[in-house]
């Protein structure tokens, strides 16, 4: 039998904690006895977190390497269904593990000779997290409402076609996004108008 850490590869060779080992074990079991075996064999995760969203509900965030995100998304709907069964109805979301590089200032410019790629900027990473979060639904529009006290509220418009699949998870998405980025977000399913 494989070890529980077979499905989790932490950066810098850190040891996975108990919760991450549990997730890893669940993925291993799915790989052993489900028809996802071929797709899951090549894939691994980098971290997992459990957070509280909206009062008493808990959500599980699973971080995956960016190059493997596409492969995970091919089987994500079934994988999430199986994992939610295993973890008694906790919502499961998959997000790519992205890195944000600090903005180059006058003082720090000498250290990194290379220009910071767009994909490592805070704005881009936060947008990408939002897209990973709502998968398999798609973001069709976005409105940022700045209130008088200069706090921001992001209204995200999701694809009406996917409303039945993701509507019950909208609160979880908002909670997870707030936890990861500190930004408030509301999800809506607007009627499409030209």
From Swiss-Prot:
This is Small ribosomal subunit protein eS7. It comes from the Eukaryota. Belongs to the eukaryotic ribosomal protein eS7 family. Component of the small ribosomal subunit. The ribosome is a large ribonucleoprotein complex responsible for the synthesis of proteins in the cell. Required for rRNA maturation. Its main location: cytoplasm. One of its GO terms (biological process) is hemopoiesis. GO terms for cellular component: centrosome; cytosolic small ribosomal subunit; nucleus; small-subunit processome. It holds the Pfam family Ribosomal_S7e. Component of the small ribosomal subunit. Keywords: Cytoplasm, Cytoskeleton, Nucleus, Ribonucleoprotein, Ribosomal protein. One of its GO terms (molecular function) is structural constituent of ribosome. It is found in: Cytoplasm, Cytoskeleton, Microtubule organizing center, Centrosome; Cytoplasm; Nucleus.
């Amino acid at each position: 039998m494989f070890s529980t850490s077979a499905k989790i590869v932490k950066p810098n060779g850190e040891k996975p904690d108990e919760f991450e080992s549990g997730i890893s074990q669940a993925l291993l079991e799915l790989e052993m006895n489900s028809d996802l075996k071929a797709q899951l064999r090549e894939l691994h995760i980098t971290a997992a977190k459990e957070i509280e969203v909206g009062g008493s509900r808990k959500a599980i965030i699973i971080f995956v390497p960016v190059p493997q995100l596409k492969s995970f998304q091919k089987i994500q709907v079934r994988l999430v269904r199986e994992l939610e069964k295993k973890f008694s109805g906790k919502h499961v979301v998959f997000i790519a593990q992205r890195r944000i590089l600090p903005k180059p200032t006058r003082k720090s410019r000498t250290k990194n000779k290379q220009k910071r790629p767009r994909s490592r900027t805070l704005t881009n990473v936060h947008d990408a997290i939002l897209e990973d979060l709502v998968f398999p639904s798609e973001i069709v529009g976005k409105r940022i409402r700045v209130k008088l006290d200069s706090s921001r509220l992001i209204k995200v418009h999701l694809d009406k076609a996917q409303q039945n699949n993701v509507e019950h998870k909208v609160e979880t998405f908002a909670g997870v996004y707030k936890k990861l980025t500190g930004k408030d977000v509301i999800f809506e399913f607007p009627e499409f108008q030209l």
